[in-house]
Regions:
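C-terminal tail/sorting-segment detector
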Residues: 126, 297-301, 316, 848, ...
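Extended carbohydrate-recognition surfaces in non-catalytic/accessory domains of CAZymes
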Residues: 26-115, 168-176, 584-588, 604-610, ...
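Active-site-adjacent substrate/metal-binding segments within catalytic domains
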Residues: 74-101, 105-114, 118-126, 131-134, ...
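Beta-strand-rich binding/interaction modules
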Residues: 125, 206-249, 284, 611-630, ...
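Short, surface-exposed loop/turn motifs with a glycine/proline- and acidic-biased composition
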Residues: 276-279, 820-827, 832, 851-881
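Accessory beta-strand-rich segments of carbohydrate-active enzymes
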Residues: 42, 54, 85, 90-193, ...
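Surface-exposed, proline-anchored Ser/Thr-rich loop/turn motifs
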Residues: 794-831, 839-847, 852, 870-871, ...
Length: 893
């Protein structure tokens, strides 16, 4: 069996200074930690109490919650209920969190922001309901200001109901399954999700940046403010600043608050354009200034890129025709359920990129904000989908009260995510209509929804994932007169007829079957058809619930644990530009148990008799060997479906090997070897050093190996047990076996195809985590993970230093290396100057002098300071020609 560690293909995102220290934090959180000085934004994920059940009076301040379970959020209360007879478990329950008002919050406007609460939540502060949100996938916020206790205890209570009404066709999870934030602002402030950064003119030489900012006045008199926006590049250089004076109308009894919009335009030269291959990010830092005093601030990441949707050319990104090689994906993960840590999402996206995938459809709902951050950084395109079914109640009320709540929910969806360059298209619904023809209510609703979206964001195309119209190509083609792209589920056979009915229509495969039982791949209807801009197969990653009850296996090419299945390489052979060859053992065209399933192909060369062999490849030809015997040569041109079959290959113990040839030269090789009996457990962590931030994750793969360290693929269903101690916790244990309903939140599980998966999360205390793994009759294994202090850098002075002689310097970043415990300090000198750089301890004593009046030429410099055994607030002080200084805080935890 293959045993080399999988190396995921990934791009290097150019976000140098953002590497600093908060491994568990998203890009947005790192930006806010770096820049926000007036606004205070705190993540309040720790210290929640949770209890299932509809408990009367649980919102009351004095309610006794001492017997409730203490947990951190994100949290999914349904994952412990998942079973063979309860594939989509709903739940009802309460969350409560006690807090005192943090320092700096007094006299401010205070809101709580929930990135996601599933489902039908009601929010209470100190016994008073302050908000509610029925559709559980959109983010929302509530004003706490009138109900806060300035001193003493405050109680935030959240009620969730995901049981009363069926609202999902797949596993949704239940509870506060995304982050929660406490935010303090001035009473004249930037509205939450109130910035829209667009790029009306794009070129590498020069680009135009348009920044639209909504300013809220929560006071009863008109307020005049200066809106100052500065554009920074990814290493922290300030590029352009613009100031605009605006007078915001007073709030009234009728309006509650008043909102005015400030539009600013800046021009940047020598631009780095965002694209899938060069995911370069800029950010806009906006300050609200009152009589020369900064009162509020906001930071927005964005990319400079141009999207065009051109008839008979397709999707153009910065003028380059781009096909969406896509997958559909639900929001859950094993074994965490709907509460997915960022590290696990990162691992998934990187594996999808390695398959040649370039696009993710967020079927069928918005996902977490940090997921889009990762796509921005890694260059993954996103088809962002709002909802499933609208008000279709067949099989359940999938979107309760859609007609009443859609304007608020759709606006929240678009406004929150509109600045992500990875998002190239909005979908306003999935399979919202059915039938052989396009029904009138579909076109009527699209005529309302599409302009509504365009009023918020004019820069992206709008589509819907349409399954109706199987005998109505003209009706489908006419949708292009309403929406920008005709999105189609399982309609690739009609693309030509639709195009004939409307030659200006652009088509996107929003959902396609993955394998079609050996028929010509759906990708073939896309790759050479300019009016079809891409497709999205169902699905990229296995998911819980839907489909399993009908007896079919999940259809992802990555399994529950993000391990690759054989047909991962089938997709890779279609999508990737790199040479691919991969061996599978079995019949590639066996009747699949459902439309969406794929035949199981073994990756074991422990067989008997004669076997069918499959090779997936994009090479010209493949030469197959069993040991030293050449079985033969096959040519890809002879297989219209790209499934190269080798029937009746005689099994011999040893090695089966496939060599992919291009232009007569060996381009790729794959082999599988005969393995022995299970002998040991082998631990394969993706990292051994974690940040002690309560968020960082080690993704631990545990293999069942033979005595020679080879994975035993077929015959290893041994029960794997583990222990964990130290400064961390397990988030559960999973395998890829969809028929195994052992609890995910457990300390043991049967292996499947020789593997289990254990995500391990750090806590907030530096130290070590010891993991022991065993299986009856096998040699045990162990692992020690190290958790190190997290480092957060915050600028006290935002402007670079310039002294009277014109010398200029800037201390703009500190980056922690968790392996060496060194903090790399970077600074820049614009003209030759004498530089001093020192580190001041919390006591006020200088503990290190990194540069002492050192004369340095113009340029960028870096040095390192070892933070071993350091905890507290340290100050980096940069002096220029012994006069002025720039200071930066470094918090070591």
């Amino acid at each position: 069996m293959r045993h080399s560690k999988i190396n995921s293909a990934s791009k290097i995102s150019v976000i140098i200074f953002l590497i600093a220290g908060i491994a568990g934090a998203s890009l947005t959180e790192r930006l806010e930690g770096r820049f926000l000085k007036s606004r205070i934004k705190l993540r309040i994920d720790e210290g929640w109490k949770v209890q299932s059940g509809n408990i009367p009076g649980a919102q009351a301040t004095g309610f006794n919650d001492s017997s409730w379970t203490t947990t951190n959020v994100p949290h999914d209360m349904s994952i412990t209920l998942y079973s063979a007879t309860n594939l989509d478990p709903g739940a009802i329950g309460w969350y409560r969190r006690h807090f005192t008002l943090p320092a700096g919050f007094a006299g401010k406007k205070v809101i709580v922001q929930f990135d996601g609460v599933y489902h039908d939540s009601k929010i209470y502060l100190n016994g008073t309901q302050v908000g509610n949100q029925q559709y559980g996938y959109v983010s929302f916020y509530c004003d706490l200001t009138p109900y806060l206790n300035a001193t003493g205890d405050n109680v935030l209570a959240v009620f969730v109901d995901n049981e009363t009404v069926r609202n999902s066709r797949w596993y949704s999870g239940t509870g506060i399954f995304r982050h929660v934030w406490l935010i303090a602002t001035d009473f004249v402030y930037v509205r939450n999700w109130g910035t829209a950064v667009t790029t009306p003119a794009v070129a590498a030489a020069q680009s135009q940046i348009r920044v639209q900012t909504d300013i809220v006045n929560d006071l009863t008199t008109a307020q005049t403010r200066t809106v100052q926006t500065t554009i920074y590049d990814s290493i922290g250089n300030a590029l352009q600043t613009v100031d605009t004076t605006i007078t915001v109308k007073p709030k009234t009894i009728d309006t509650v608050m008043s909102i005015d919009t400030c539009v600013q335009t800046l021009v940047l030269s020598s631009c780095n354009l965002w694209s899938p291959s060069t995911p370069y990010l800029y950010y806009a830092y906006t300050r609200i200034i009152n009589n020369a005093t900064p009162a509020d601030d906001y930071v927005t990441q964005f990319g400079i890129r141009q999207l065009q949707y051109v008839a008979n050319q397709g999707l153009l990104i910065n003028g380059v025709a781009t096909k969406m090689k896509g997958i559909c994906m639900h929001h859950m993960a094993v074994p965490t359920g709907a509460a997915v840590p960022e590290r696990m999402s990162e691992r998934t996206i990187k594996e999808l990129l390695a398959s040649g995938c370039t696009s993710i459809r967020t079927s069928h709902n918005p996902v977490s904000p940090e997921f889009y951050d990762l796509c921005d950084q890694l260059g993954m395109l996103v088809l962002d989908e709002w909802c499933d079914k609208w008000y279709d109640t067949s099989g359940g009320a999938f979107y309760e009260n859609w007609a009443q709540t859609w304007p608020k929910d759709l606006a929240s969806f678009i406004e929150r995510d509109r600045n992500h360059p990875s998002i190239v298209m909005w979908s306003v619904g999935n399979e919202v209509a059915s039938g052989a023809t396009v029904p009138p209510y579909l076109t009527t609703n699209l005529q309302i929804l599409v302009p509504y979206v365009k009023n918020i964001d004019k820069t992206r195309a709008v589509t819907n994932a349409c399954v109706a119209g199987s005998s109505d190509p003209a009706g489908l083609g006419a949708l292009a007169n309403i929406e920008d792209i005709v999105g189609l589920n399982y309609k690739e056979a009609q693309y030509g007829a639709i195009h004939s009915s409307n030659p200006n229509a652009l088509i996107l495969g929003t959902e396609q079957a993955p394998y079609l039982n050996g028929a010509v791949p759906t990708w073939f209807a896309v790759r050479n058809t300019p009016y079809v801009i891409g497709h999205h197969i169902w699905v990229g990653v296995d998911f819980l619930a839907e489909g399993i009850s009908s007896g079919g296996p999940p259809s992802g090419y990555l399994d529950y644990c993000i391990f690759r299945k054989a047909w991962f390489y089938y997709q890779q052979s279609q999508w990737s530009d790199s040479p691919v060859v991969h061996i599978g053992i079995g019949n590639a065209v066996d009747p699949a148990p459902s439309t969406w399933a794929t035949p199981f192909l073994s990756e074991s060369w422990n067989q008997s008799g004669s076997v069918n062999v499959v090779t997936y490849t994009n090479c010209d030809s493949v030469i197959l060997y069993v040991n030293a015997t050449k079985i033969g040569t096959e040519y890809l041109n002879n297989f219209s479906n790209m499934i190269m079959q080798w029937p009746n290959v005689q099994y011999q113990s040893g090695v089966i090997k496939a060599i992919g040839m291009k232009s007569g030269i060996q381009a790729a090789v794959d082999s599988i070897m005969t393995v022995g009996k299970p002998a040991k457990v082998f631990l394969k962590p993706d990292r051994t050093t974690l940040y002690a931030d309560g968020e960082d994750i080690c993704c631990l793969e545990v293999d069942i190996d033979d005595a020679n360290d080879n994975l035993v693929f077929n015959d290893s269903t041994d029960t794997v047990q583990f222990t964990l101690s130290g400064q961390g916790r397990s988030l559960g244990i999973g395998s890829a076996d969809y028929t195994n309903f052992e609890p995910f939140k457990a300390m043991s599980r049967k292996a499947y195809n020789g593997r289990v998966f254990i995500p391990i999360q750090s806590d907030t205390v530096p130290g070590t985590i010891t993991v022991g793994v065993s299986s009856p009759g096998l040699t045990s294994g162990s692992l020690i993970l190290t958790t190190v202090p997290q480092v957060i850098t915050t600028a006290i002075r935002s402007a670079p230093l310039r002294n009277t002689q014109g010398s200029r310097a800037d201390l703009f970043t500190c980056v922690c290396n968790p392996d060496s415990k060194n903090i790399q300090v970077r600074y820049r000198v614009d003209v030759p100057s004498a530089i001093s750089l020192s580190v001041i301890a919390p006591s006020g004593r200088m503990v290190n002098c990194l540069a002492n009046n050192k004369y340095q030429a113009a340029g960028a410099y870096s040095t390192e300071w070892n933070a071993m055994n350091r905890i507290g607030v340290y100050l980096f002080v940069l002096k220029i020609n012994n006069t002025k200084m720039v200071r930066k805080i470094c918090i070591v935890r």
